[in-house]
Amino acid sequence: MADIATRELRQPIDIAEYLFRRLHEVGIRSVHGVPGDYNLAALDYLPKCGLHWVGNCNELNAGYAADGYARVNGIAALVTTFGVGELSAINAIAGAYSEFVPIIHIVGQPHSRSQKDGLLLHHTLGNGDYNVFSSMNKGISVTTANLNDTYDAATLIDNAIRECWIHSRPVYLALPTDMITKKIEGERLKTPIDLSLPANDPEKEDYVVDVVLKYLHAAKNPVILVDACAIRHRVLEEVHDLIEVSGLPTFVAPMGKGAVNETHRCYGGVYAGTGSNPGVREQVESSDLILSIGAIKSDFNTAGFSYRIGQLNTIDFHSTYVRVRYSEYPDTNMKGVLRKVIQRLGFIKADPVPHISNALPEHEKNSSEQRITHAWMWPMVGQWLKENDIVITETGTANFGIWDTRFPSGVTAISQVLWGSIGYSVGACQGAALAAKEQGNRRTVLWVGDGSLQLTLQEISTMIRNNLNPIIFVICNEGYTIERFIHGWDESYNDIQTWDIKGLPVAFGGKGRYKGYKVTTRDELTKLFASEEFSSAPCLQLVEVHMPREDAPASLKITAEAAASRNK
């Protein structure tokens, strides 16, 4: 017989089912994670809620994969188990928090009674403290909630999902085993979660818009600089419209790659201080007004803090404030302000932008060199990429090399420039490729170094298991290149064991389901790029790209030198 509380419910539903139906509502179709005894019963609810269980090789990789999935899909979910599982994932969650990536982290916990009694259970620290792990997550989550009471479980779930979306950062939900089947009111599901941004105060917003327009109309050579938070806080439509209406020269920071249509007439390239193309650097740094949208001024995003633009010439647009020169307007999100700026802009005088293309530099065109170098390869990559590709680059040479690639339209760029956890890109590739498959099978391309690959290569197994077909290029240059440029060029700690990389998928049960390649010359890579079969991505493909150990993009060398000097 149902208890009194259940009989009072109009549409009783189990907490786990309610949670997973809410995930489906906000667009999640696949859930990453690793099964554990405290989350197993909850996983039984996934199929009936229209959700696919991915099943990763470990929780860290699952967290990276959820991150990649969220960057393509908009939001992601991760399920781990208490203690050992959630702590394995915590590095990935910290990276998502750092880089504004929305992940709903669901942690299966022991029975509420066991927690109350302080039992000495497995996966605990042996001290009866069952809050210690959720406390660890508080600093890297917008909100943490324990679903240990039917009275407010639905409210906590809805609020957490809304906070995750609005702030574009992870949230943490603890689900004790005894609460999985507890009944709550399912009638709430008829009302979708409100994911709309809180409106700005109209009077304040209008004032900020007037101030922005005053400086913009007074400027002689203004430019637009777009960065990562324009992507994360979903103002790309406003950015596109601002570019169209104003015609202003538009540049992106490294973390902003993919935010702007790079085939647009106003696109001028990547600005990263001294790591920039000279023409880009000159135009940005000589501008008398920079409209900076969603900036993250980290060391790797600015080529070692080498920006030469003053706050006196800058208007910063962010998700929670707008700063005009040295005056800050808090509690004013950029989405509403940008929309009104676009509507009221009128005529603006715009300078032409530097010509950016994927043409090879002259010294590379005329070279008889057959070794594959970064200066030669990245423009070639730009020529090979297709519209709507998803391009993932690992921390290291790939992250910096991609600056020299002009994307076709519709490309999504994924990297982890701020958090910079090596190995991230392999897990992110699995999640991104899965989201792409759900959306219609956009091509997913990964560039990763041989050193970084060794941290997370198990996710190639997950790619095979889920029938994903990314093209994975592995830069084989005998170890940790960016670390060599920072410190210890010839030291053994920057070396790695050489692997037969193109043969790895066989060990993961992928025999006959993938293709492996090894290229050591420019002619070989050019021939591979020209192959229609290869470029159509019919299956998972793994390419060893052998490059000189001493070679690196110029921007990496500049940034590494700055990092080395700060470490002394």
From Swiss-Prot:
Binds 1 Mg(2+) per subunit. Binds 1 thiamine pyrophosphate per subunit. Pyruvate binds at residues 37, 123, 483. Thiamine diphosphate binds at residues 397, 420-422, 451-452, 477-482. Disulfide bonds: none annotated. Gene3D superfamilies: 3.40.50.970, TPP-binding domain (3.40.50.1220). Its cofactor is Mg(2+); thiamine diphosphate. Keywords: Decarboxylase, Lyase, Magnesium, Metal-binding, Thiamine pyrophosphate. GO terms for biological process: aromatic amino acid family catabolic process to alcohol via Ehrlich pathway. One of its GO terms (molecular function) is pyruvate decarboxylase activity. Pfam families: TPP_enzyme_C, TPP_enzyme_M, TPP_enzyme_N. GO terms for cellular component: cytosol; nucleus. Mg(2+) binds at residues 450, 477, 479. Its EC number is 4.1.1.1. SUPFAM superfamilies: DHS-like NAD/FAD-binding domain, Thiamin diphosphate-binding fold (THDP-binding). It catalyses: a 2-oxocarboxylate + H(+) = an aldehyde + CO2; pyruvate + H(+) = acetaldehyde + CO2. Belongs to the TPP enzyme family. Homotetramer. PANTHER family: PYRUVATE DECARBOXYLASE, PYRUVATE DECARBOXYLASE ISOZYME 1-RELATED. This is Pyruvate decarboxylase. It comes from Emericella nidulans (strain FGSC A4 / ATCC 38163 / CBS 112.46 / NRRL 194 / M139) (Aspergillus nidulans).
